[in-house]
Amino acid sequence: MNKLPERIRIKDIARLADVSVGTVDRVIHGRSGVSEASKKRVEEILKQLDYQPNMYASALASNKKYTFICLLPEHLEGEYWTAVETGIHEAIATYSDFNTSVKINYYDPYDYHSFENASEAILALQPDGVMVAPTAPQYTKGFTDQLQALDIPYIYIDSNIKDVPPLAFFGQNSRQSGYFAARMMMLLARDEKEIVIFRKIHEGIVGSNQQENREIGFRQYMKEHHPSCTILELDLHAERNDEDNEMLDEFFRTYPTVKNGITFNSKAYIVGEYLQSRGKKDFNLIGYDLLERNVTCLKEGSISFLLSLIHISEPTRP
């Protein structure tokens, strides 16, 4: 066998199999019009060379356009999902040669009807793929069942739902993250017997599946290693931030000896900025995500630790 170039080309395979380039192309792409004898020779050569098609070149040669839709929770500029959106748009710009485009639909994470309406709009468009941020499992399954019925691939970002498996998931293991956060909390708390969990709640609903799983992991660690530590809870309003300071004032009047707390959402800055405004420098606070206001609180000392993925780059992975 003559020496082959480092990068195997279709014409090299055609020469070795003694067939035309067109025949090799038809075999590689599973098209008809090839005799069994020629097909067998080509497949043997492909196997010997461990040939892998150049998907990038194939995509460039194709005129097909791909439309993806991403379903995200509604959010304000500068919040956690802003960075995720940035990553999505960067990915589309990076791989623009593949004729891809993306549309982002939004839903209210506290309103099932909002999610239902947004998902129905996506199904009507029948895109080539869907990215879902599944903040609530009870909202998601009906949607993904319909995607599967239409043979539309979907991936999860940020939060995973094991009972409804996607093509891929990009995010952290939320329960392990909460378990680790509890360990960090108790390194700060040492022998303290009380800690507090701060939540953002709307009509009894936590904003995301991810937050719930973080808390499950947190409580698991506490049960295993610090069962005598009392875990207090303060539920702040998800949509009425003007009342947060009053609720925090009332909490600390009721529990003046509590010196350690954690929040499992991305808005630790709400508590951090409150601590600054009240001059409370003896409170250890752990939060999530590198939002600008969180980082400012971290630098100024009102947040002790932030746990975060480098999430801006997550959606840009090929």
Annotated model-derived regions:
Residues 73-82, 104-114, 171-177, 199-217, ...:
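Hinge/beta->alpha junction and helix N-cap segments in small-molecule ligand-binding domains
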Residues 94-98, 150, 222-229, 276-283:
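Short helix-capping segments at alpha-helix termini
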Residues 117, 129-148, 232-293:
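Hydrophobic alpha-helical
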Residues 179-196:
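A conserved helix-loop-strand patch within extracytoplasmic ligand-binding domains
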